[in-house]
């Protein structure tokens, strides 16, 4: 049986290489011919910046797909007799618009909630009207964006009557922000963090970023930094703590700025976010005093330093006084409380004294303003939270690492019930922290996975929202492409498909696959995108399947793209060899139905999907993805060429893990039984794994700069195949 598996693995690798070689030679994916379409007039509420943004984006899209001219006009300019083709973007409070819609035969608009919208079409006397009516300014903006997507995916004539409302109320980005060498985020050491110090102080970056995430249906931007207060506020009595200028990770001055100019900068960012319907939150960890250690006040990270408590409490109050557009603050009762880290009662009292009282101080001055507060549910116990923080007049939510650090593992992770739902009150809302410390490089795209993840969020009012992001990566501008633009491409644009899925499907998990295929077709100028959609989905199932088979929960322990771990646990530092794969600590993901490698080898578990069956599934997914993209010709389309390369990279990684899983199982069985045929099989499989790894390296190297420094994982050199070679040596030694 094992010999058949070896032959099967070799055949898959050989077939994959042939398909890849032929992929760019095929001409099925030629660009679709441009179509000349009718003129369109877009009427919009020009008093609302986010609606104006939507109208201008729609103008760009309609022009791109061939409508000419596309003219923008204010609602007040709408004539009694309509043009041949027109669009209306407005709020449902505009009674003249609603009356005109009904006069022209449009379906009546009912009551609409926050961010909800309806699409309506009218066709009286051959005059085609397309209407986006929002329950508020943001809903109207989303309606206009939706019409643009429909037009891009096919034709504006595909717009149909429909009512839309957000499935998840708050859909956010988790942005670990490298403010300054003196003001670090959780981990700015990687290439992505280091390269983005300059960008986060560029207003044009934030405008492009906020425009992009608004179109992707995100309405929350959470900015995470260990101790941002010296940058953000000047606190009475502690004025000298405020920091001027900006320094990068190496201590190089990158921008001369007074503190007042910094405040003005962040006020502009928050104003712009508000104009795109996006809330801004700041998140902090405790206890940190970065940037303020050397002042005259004696500020330290000691839990018993009363001056530190006073400074941070007053910083919280000043934060809301300084930024009227700031929605809220999130905080973590860790991970730096020294000998008090496990004293939850002490920590929660400290956090209440600082953050709770700081907010109450502000509310005394401005009782009408609602202040959001999120208490991260990490290194604590709700027993010590509820009675304290329930005193906040505007309430508070919890936050929880929904999949630990493995967003790409299972869409229905099993942890939340026992960790949160069973130990907190029925009415307690929680934000789900969707931690992606799995995929930093390759473009991912599985709509069904995202849909099921969203539908599996707890109901009964327990979901406040979600934030999507990483601890070990900065999702600002990309820093690894061999084809860089100037300025460098946004990560949200490079990974536009996955960001769109996590945003748009959070708003509407029933988003049509046909619409998504149409958007792929438009993005990459394809005649048909069905093959790309299916192949991308197949390739994107590989990493989650690997993570379910070998579930290693935290970012520092395991990075699947590099097959490595680092930092806290020396036993799993560096490349993860077959010996580490056999470590009984890392079995199949709970409730996944998969038998982990150690349990399969030992015989502890016999019911479920075996590792060898997983290996077969990985090869099948790889073969399906390669076959699907074999007829797509990228031509000179760099984005499509890199996307196809990322699909092939995931394929090669899947083939690598398929062979490695087989080799690990065979080695484990050899050690258990002493049968030499298992050892021979292990060596053969691991040689196949080495071949697959080298193919993986070639795919990555076609698009990316090698030797990236990945936070928590050190330098990733994909041409360094000493790890896969070590696996072979381990098997040879037995």
Question: Where on the chain are the PLM-derived regions?
Answer:
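Aromatic-lined, polymer-binding surfaces characteristic
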Residues: 285-309, 322-330, 334-337, 344-348, ...
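Conserved, mostly hydrophobic/aromatic
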Residues: 62, 136, 213, 331, ...
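Feature activates predominantly on carbohydrate-active enzymes
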Residues: 57, 61, 105-307, 324-325, ...
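Acidic, contiguous N-terminal accessory segments
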Residues: 11-15, 23-123, 157
